[in-house]
Amino acid sequence: KFLMVDVKQTPETYGIDADKRPKAQFYIGLSLLLPITIYLFVFYVSASYSAFFKDFESTSLTAAIFAPNALKNAISDGWLEAVFVGTIPFVFMGLGYLLHMFQKTKRTMSYLKLGALFILTFMFDIILAYLIEKKIFDYERVLGEFFSPSIAIQSVNFWGIIFAGFVVYVIWGLVFDFVMNEHENVDKIK
């Protein structure tokens, strides 16, 4: 029993590489990760519902992105819509988890996979932003005007949607990676 206490107090004596930083970093990271996760869930449920199923009644960006009853409306629209809208946030969280896993190995292939994940996520956010911006455009369209990618790219709403999703997704992935790394350091010796 004395040996176990000694190992915990001086792990380097026994050849164990243990970080003695306080557990506070883990708990601070976790306390940041939880609300960011909730935000991502709300954002992607709302944005995906708005992009694929919502009929617009306003040109407000907030109303376009954040549909307060998106999940409830998707459920009432049908089980397929509910499953689609309800599971999209987990796709992004899964991609964030893969970011963490690919960062563990420092190989060229891992960096290529990381780049591919960022591009994939960014492209999906572009699709969501494009579809939402198109619905806003169609709502306020003047007869004879047609929506195009160049109109979307010039729209502040388009970029606002991308950054509200993609930038927060990147932050979530980095915080998640930090929390997972700190969790490994909390107690290497049990």
Task: Please annotate each region the language model reported.
Residues 1-27, 179-190:
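Long, non-membrane, amphipathic alpha-helices that form coiled-coils
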Residues 19-183:
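Hydrophobic alpha-helical transmembrane segments of integral membrane proteins
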